[in-house]
């Protein structure tokens, strides 16, 4: 029997060069760095009417001003920090007002005032895993943001804050918990990190150094800023804080660096002017409500995003960090007031309350703008924010598209072949001849 033509499945039997290339890309997926979904500034000086500035090497503290520390190689424990050089602090359960917080996680309140529960200390970070095993986790915070290694992700949209402009009444609780100054926020302050990722604000607090040493938690290219603000949020998918601890995306923190400026920041003065009233550990007062959004940068579109942890015990992981590129400017007097007004445990001045930066261990820090490109005078490769799953989906989609197109083209060729064969066949009626009988 004669063949009807080439098989329509021929494109599948012999891989085309395009398909071979896609298969090669598929094999390279495993080499991609780990992004957010895989784990569960170089700004210049400039005038800003809001009293803010962008991150830049020219506005960063000098190397001699910053405490000497470097991230250890991936997979190794961070170096021990000398307790005489500084203290460390960050987001712990004592900073997240909740009745569900375990007693041993409530900080060092009352250590010499009649209290007796166990607690962590800033000078003994290597002992933190004994308080909470999560402190030895691989995805801890804070981290050093290396601009040239950030991954530009176009899907990161400007943040929208709802209800952050509070009225003077009702009043808010401002407290000194022995580790930081904390402002408890009322219900109604909401934000979204993306579709289906809604959060409500719980509280805000600060981290600072001294007049000689800057005290931000995160660093940029190894440089530390004078201070840092954190606004802590709980995912609306959870009704209680303890339910969200350790869950991917259960908590989200907005962080911004505080930078020295000749001018006073009126928004921060509404907080700093009350510090003398809560100078003693454990003290608390009520202050008028204020515009919380004014404590953050005016540009909410340029930021860095990564998944990390609380930075004090229990060091729960799964926290989504958003670190803004634009800094907030305070006067030198205001920064000094922040660093000398409060007292902590054992009648020690509350200063240098930040944790050492932690190794990334394969994590990718995403950026909502091409920070890697801006940070170097020479052309650099801008990393992709696509995760391994995104790349797999893209590769398989392209393979399916190429195969489908090849199949359709083959069917079309076969159809044309059949049509041409029919056109070449002519019909001639048989002639009848008369024959004599």
UniProtKB/Swiss-Prot annotation:
Signal peptide range: 1-31
Pfam families: Carb_anhydrase (PF00194)
Keywords attached to this entry: Cell membrane, Cell projection, Disulfide bond, Glycoprotein, Lyase, Membrane, Metal-binding, Nucleus, Phosphoprotein, Signal, Transmembrane, Transmembrane helix, Zinc
Entry-linked PROSITE patterns: ALPHA_CA_1, ALPHA_CA_2
One Gene Ontology cellular component: microvillus membrane
Domain of life: Eukaryota
Role of this protein: Catalyzes the interconversion between carbon dioxide and water and the dissociated ions of carbonic acid (i.e. bicarbonate and hydrogen ions).
Designated name of the protein: Carbonic anhydrase 9
Originating gene: Ca9
